[in-house]
């Protein structure tokens, strides 16, 4: 999530957190994993909260899309600094900042050993980053979607607000929808369900967790059909 990039800051990008993410991604990249990344923009601007303050929703969402491009460029630079090749693809044309996204370009880059960062959401307003990442995951025929957040999985209720909340290790999409759990927004959840794309929700802020998920350790929550 874009918000995770804030680290200890109130806003923007925490360079230490960015470097930690880059190192974790490098670690699994060196294991031969093909990686496509979609990152949010909540650390810079959220279209929906902008709309609540009187912004036109479409313009607000476009600002949010641009925020994801800023984060993608930052992550790309951090990855290159660790010696990993990274490519930013954008859902709207903005060469030379990034290349225009296509499924074939993304797959080609990943097969050539590059980490692909897919930015600017779906290129359309009214779609969240969750929906953007679900769409891209389905398009590039990913084996699994990893949703790195600030929480260590899916709970029966918000663990920050409800001390009795318990964590699911494993849950079906039907159960998520029935319980109204906020894993992702409804559109994204339904897309993953319909296209049989499993998700692992885990805490990305704990160093080493990404490698554990890839190694098959049971951390976070697996969502599947």
Tell me the role of every PLM-derived stretch.
Residues 1-225:
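C-terminal catalytic "cap/lid" subdomain
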């Amino acid at each position: 999530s874009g918000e995770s990039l804030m680290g200890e800051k109130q806003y923007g990008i925490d360079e230490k957190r960015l470097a930690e993410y880059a190192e974790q991604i490098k670690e699994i990249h060196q294991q031969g994993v093909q990686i496509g990344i979609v990152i949010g923009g909540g650390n810079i601007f959220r279209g929906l909260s902008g709309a609540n303050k009187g912004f036109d929703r479409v313009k607000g969402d476009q600002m949010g899309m641009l925020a994801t491009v800023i984060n993608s460029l930052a992550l790309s630079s951090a990855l290159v600094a660790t010696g990993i090749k990274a490519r930013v693809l954008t859902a709207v044309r903005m060469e030379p900042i990034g290349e225009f996204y296509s499924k074939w370009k993304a797959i080609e880059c990943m097969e050539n050993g590059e980490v692909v960062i897919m930015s600017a959401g779906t290129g359309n307003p009214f779609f969240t980053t969750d929906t953007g990442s679900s769409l891209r995951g389905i398009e590039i025929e990913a084996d699994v979607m990893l949703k790195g957040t600030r929480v260590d999985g899916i709970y029966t209720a918000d663990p920050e607000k409800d001390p009795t909340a318990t964590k699911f290790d494993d849950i079906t999409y039907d159960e998520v929808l029935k319980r109204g759990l906020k894993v992702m927004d409804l559109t994204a959840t339904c897309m993953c369900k319909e296209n049989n794309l499993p998700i692992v929700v885990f805490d990305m802020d704990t160093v080493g967790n990404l490698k554990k998920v890839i190694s098959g350790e049971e951390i976070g929550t697996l969502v599947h059909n």
